[in-house]
UniProtKB/Swiss-Prot annotation:
GO terms for biological process: regulation of postsynaptic density assembly. Glycosylated. This is Leucine-rich repeat and fibronectin type III domain-containing protein 1. Glycans are attached at N87, N343. It is a single-pass type I membrane protein. It comes from Rattus norvegicus (Rat). InterPro entries: Cys-rich_flank_reg_C, FN3_dom, FN3_sf, Ig-like_dom, Ig-like_dom_sf, Ig-like_fold, Ig_I-set, Ig_sub. Mainly expressed in brain (at protein level) and testis. In brain, found in cerebral cortex (including pyramidal neurons), hippocampus (including CA3 and CA1 neurons), dentate gyrus, cerebellum (including Purkinje neurons) (at protein level) (at protein level). Also expressed in the olfactory bulb. CDD domains: FN3. The modification Phosphoserine is found at S713.
Amino acid sequence: MAPGPFSSGLLSPPPAALPFLLLLWAGASRGQPCPGRCICQNVAPTLTMLCAKTGLLFVPPAIDRRVVELRLTDNFIAAVRRRDFANMTSLVHLTLSRNTIGQVAAGAFADLRALRALHLDSNRLAEVRGDQLRGLGNLRHLILGNNQIRKVESAAFDAFLSTVEDLDLSYNNLEALPWEAVGQMVNLNTLTLDHNLIDHIAEGTFVQLHKLVRLDMTSNRLHKLPPDGLFLRSQGGGPKPPTPLTVSFGGNPLHCNCELLWLRRLTREDDLETCATPEHLTDRYFWSIPEEEFLCEPPLITRQAGGRALVVEGQAVSLRCRAVGDPEPVVHWVAPDGRLLGNSSRTRVRGDGTLDVTITTLRDSGTFTCIASNAAGEATAPVEVCVVPLPLMAPPPAAPPPLTEPGSSDIATPGRPGANDSATERRLVAAELTSSSVLIRWPAQRPVPGIRMYQVQYNSSADDSLVYRMIPSTSQTFLVNDLAAGRAYDLCVLAVYDDGATALPATRVVGCVQFTTAGDPAPCRPLRAHFLGGTMIIAIGGVIVASVLVFIVLLMIRYKVYGDGDSRRIKGTSRSPPRVSHVCSQTNGSSAQQASAPPAPDRYEALREVAVPAAIEAKAMEAEATSTELEVVLGRSLGGSATSLCLLPSEETSGEESRAVTGPRRSRSGALGPPTSAPPTLALVRGGSPARPRPQQRYSFDGDYGALFQSHSYPRRARRTKRHRSTPHLDGAGGGAAGEDGDLGLGSARARLAFTSTEWMLESTV
């Protein structure tokens, strides 16, 4: 049966009806409405949604969960939330380029198990954490270029290490990468790391990257590239490699030394890499430099610890070792037993080569070796460490004596319950306990031989400070001073001796004791003997000085009083100066001496001249003639020696006249009387015989004063001669001469010489 006209129309619609049918199919296929300003294409078997340049601030929630390709480029999305891509198990291609994404929630892509390409370039990502890319087990292409990434965690790529083929991290701020994770990307074809801050590539990173086709390290901070067989494929040498390799490392500050010699030996024609260092190769093309100029310098150790380090066991010690070279040397340390030291709980090697040993042991005694090595060689330097062992505690003997063997050396022993009853307590005796001191006694330690010294340690109940005292081994007592009053003390005595087993000093406790000082403060003590003696000396000296001062003051007062009286008398007598009219001087009979010129005036004025009336002068002449005989007789008996001088009045003179002639009298108290008018007569009186008259001779007493005393071998004062010689004679002659006038007798009316104030002062002082 031939088909009719309608049957052919149902099977194949005419061309004019095709547009209408497409519109019907598109409308029927809309399970969900397409977001506003987005383009949705449902071309079987894929559903594509394109929302580019639509001004989105976040991922639209009305996206069909069956979408296969989603492009949200050139928008203002700031964050990717956990619910944005939930249940999109069919999504294969996700593009979020050129947004402002700075945050990606943990597990935001966990449901995208079928995702193969993820584009997050040109955003504001600062780091890539390990939980952000979790769940992407089928990821092939990861594009993270042109962000602000400074750090990539080592677990960030764990979900797709075996599947990723293209990794782009260009134009970021990366200083390092998890090179260990990169080395495990065995299917990696393209690795783009240009325009970063990478200065180091771990050696052996590209060993397993056999499928790597392109490596871009342009414009980083690489100084060197580690030697790797990967770069041989770029030369085509040897067997034909499965895939060619393109390596770009221009724009890096390459340090052209022997470490890059392997790279220089490769043949390159179109690369323009230049050298930055050393100075003689700066700005020269890497491939044009001869191989002979790629040189290295062996290490040289410039600073190390002293030849010997002395440390006490248990203390820390630091050993320094620094070296220079090209390339920079790496420093290692070898222990005395040959072990290579590294960072551990007890040792640490710093970046500058210093070795720190935090806790030293006796095994550390020996020579540590510092090894500095680089590509050109190595250098070594020994450092000797001497560990001083601490004193060891000697083990207790097998059978210690019950009361003589010392116990443990623990200052806290007296504080334990029952410690006061132990044998250790009974060995020490605290005697003479006061508020500030105590005397400790202990017996001799015969069971402990070789005692060097004793160590006394004590502390107070009020604080935790422990005081140590070292005393000789010969002492068995110790006086502890400067203790606080009213406090309890724990005191132990230890014996320091030589241990024969270890040849090291050891300590054993001799004994411990507890005591409490008196609570009352120390009373005031009397002054010591030497202080008292000094005080007495000062007191006696003060009394003596005060007495001398009082005596001097009294003497000055007396001198001033009598001096004023003498000056007044001198002023009174100076108005009518007297003169001496009858003066007789008995000398040795030398007329030459009498006729000689008068000497210079003596400072002692013996006599004063008094004006005498004429009647009295006549009587005086008779008395003078009478006394001449007696004077001659006495002159013979004296044998020419000088006799005493006296001034006598005449016998015929009355008592009143006698008082007038004698001049100023001196009372027993030493005061001078007024002068008399009677002329004095110089006579020599002996016994009671009358004096015979003789021719009158006048001598000037002042003129003959020098001749009178020249016969003596020592000077004599006229005043003393007149008082001690003339006065007694005058007294003796007074009885016989008192003739008619009792008052004119020599016994009752003595002629007194007038002395000056100076002579009187000398007499008073004596």
